[in-house]
UniProtKB/Swiss-Prot annotation:
NCBIfam families referenced in this protein's UniProt entry, alphabetically: mutS2
InterPro entries reported for this sequence: DNA_mismatch_repair_MutS_C (IPR000432), DNA_mismatch_repair_MutS_core (IPR007696), DNA_mismatch_repair_MutS_sf (IPR036187), MSSS (IPR046893), MutS (IPR045076), MutS2 (IPR005747), P-loop_NTPase (IPR027417), Smr_dom (IPR002625)
Binding site for ATP: 335-342
Chain's gene name: mutS2
Organism expressing this protein natively: Shouchella clausii (strain KSM-K16)
PANTHER family, alphabetized: OS10G0509000 PROTEIN, OS10G0509000 PROTEIN-RELATED
Protein name: Endonuclease MutS2
Amino acid sequence: MERVQRVLEYNKMKQQLLEHVASSLGRQKVNELVPSTSLEEVRHLQDETAEAANVLRLKGHVPLGGISDVRPHIKRAAIGGVLSATELIEIASTLYGGKRVKQFIETIIEDGHIEVPILAGHVEQIEPLSPIEKAIKQCIDDNGYVLDSASTSLRTVRHQIRSYESGIKSKLDQLTRSSNTRKMLSDAIVTIRSDRYVLPVKQEYRGTFGGIVHDQSSSGATLFIEPAAIVTLNNQLTEAKAKEKREIERILRELSAKVAEESEQLLLNVDKLAQLDFICAKAYYAKAVKAVKPTLNDRGYLDLRQARHPLLPPDKVVPSDMAIGDQVRSLVITGPNTGGKTVTLKTIGLLTLMAQSGLFVPAAEETELAVFEHIFADIGDEQSIEQSLSTFSSHMKNIVSILNEMNENSLILFDELGAGTDPTEGAALAISILDHVYKRGALAVATTHYSELKGYAYNREGALNASVEFDVETLRPTYRLLVGVPGRSNAFAISRRLGLDERIIDQAKLQIDSDASQVEKMIASLEDSQKSAQSEWSRAEAVRREAEALKRDLEKRMASFEEMKEAALQKAEQKAEKVVAAAQENAELIISELRDLQKQGVAVKEHQLIEARKQLEEAAPKLVSKKRKQVKKQAEKAKRLPEPGDEVKVLSFNQKGTVVKKIGDNEYQVQLGIMKMAVPIDDIQLLEQERRQPEKAITTIRGNDAHVKAELDLRGERYEDAMRRVEKYIDDALLAGYHQVSIIHGKGTGALRKGVKQFVANHPRVKSARDGGMNEGGLGNTVIELK
């Protein structure tokens, strides 16, 4: 299988697949990918790809950022090792990524728009382990710095360090400002040697200056001396830093122990994330190459529809249609060299390998492929499709091996069968080999330019001819496969087109016997008939597509009409509601005035006031009642009840609010401004909006908001790791309330800068991005404005 993968360029296809993984976890899975020979397993692999493809169609992406292969860290912690701060934050980031993708899939399951049982099975085994994530993030920031808040002792000792450093700098500043001292210094700066603060003193003042010499310049003209006035403070600072180091080690040891306690579940989480990354990569790749899920069988039947080779440029590849299997067990593709026969052969083989690997195939719907136990290919000398053919002996050695290993559940691909030797003998061998393969029950597709094999399919049961179309006018192959029609050499037509004397061509025709001439004429007639039938089919297909387009357009117009009708009714009702409200306001004013008159002794009967109010109040509830019926109808159509966080409209108040919680079978608590009130379900209208993510999805990182910096330094990072950090950093910056942040990537080769620009350009929460100004780092810094 390894040899046929190389011949059919399976590994090149895997390189394309690698472009769609989100992490090194998915990359490892792709590198391990091999075709399966079990129909049941292949169907499962195809089903998981289909689930991920449906998720992409519904949501557009799967959030897999921030995850990385932390298995070595986990295993080291499990045997008692102490992890570094960077390793621990990578574990926390992977936990966060796992929690996010778990919530993402669970939300899809709750919505019920699509079924994802395989993906659900994977995320079900992922445990968020929030206590570990929270513990790490409370102690370490995203840059791997252990925070002061990690412990009381660390906060205290760092306060001491800052105090000592401040005292040292103050004394050194006094010395550098002193006119007596300044003349002794090579430069009025403070520097550090051997973790001690020192001043650069000229060699000639060594005895005068006093203090401890820690270093000297390469020329010897400058000595780096620790002044006697700060020796004690420097000693205290050194001791404090040693305490800080011990405390950090203690914190890292405790966090590593927490990781060790959950090492088994952590490893399972990572394995499931690797599987999810791989499955989603297959779906992303299918979308990129416009691939479909094939129907599968185990009876050796292939039905390729508009099949395309995935390694060829989409604008140049010509789709092919062909069916082989069941009654037809051998397909012989004839025609001249450079006609595209080898491309067709490789397309059949590679698409079969892709399907057996659980990948969708670049073809049209209803494509069907078989799952074979063995796939063999004798194609050239294992060269790319542009290279020349191998020798006869090389071909024959490979063919002998194939014939010895094949069985009835095998697919065999022969390129230029019988080539490289005497044409008569080569053709005879080719016919005999094809007969042998047919008797063994295997499926064979062979290409040849020998005219002797053109009649093979007409004389053999279970065999079919095919050819690759050649345009005599342009002298170029069209690469279109014509099934049922053997290929022609077109030698006379091509020679005439190139200007060969007609007398020479006529003389050459006399050298061909009448039977051969009749065969060529028959082939030409078949080819013309095939083209005519194909043309008619294309016209019929165009009419069908036009009819479907008209049907879709009509449905769209009907839907638009219904929306316009509904909008007009709603507008009329709103207008009526305003009229009633205005009338009610005026009536209330009149009733108030009547009461004033009543108090003044004017005869106004109370029952008249009550009746007037009653008539006014009866008008508005009718509108509200009608509105409630509409809302109920819309709710039934939407098939979704309000949920906490949903924005709604309370009809009786005509006010927008937010659902807090459900407090009864048909009653919800709604936040209206500063008020919370109970509202019945038929008084609530769900507003059109993107559904909010539950608050619990972000609460675990609140403790880290205070430590998010206004800039992210990516210098020295690998591209893949850098992109994960950018995605995570933008999420944290938004949660921390930043409106503008900077991402430092350096100038270097420009790869990081380009990657950052491409990422933020597609981020929904990024308003704009620009290069830093002269005082902002220039092209080495990208300044991002957040929405």
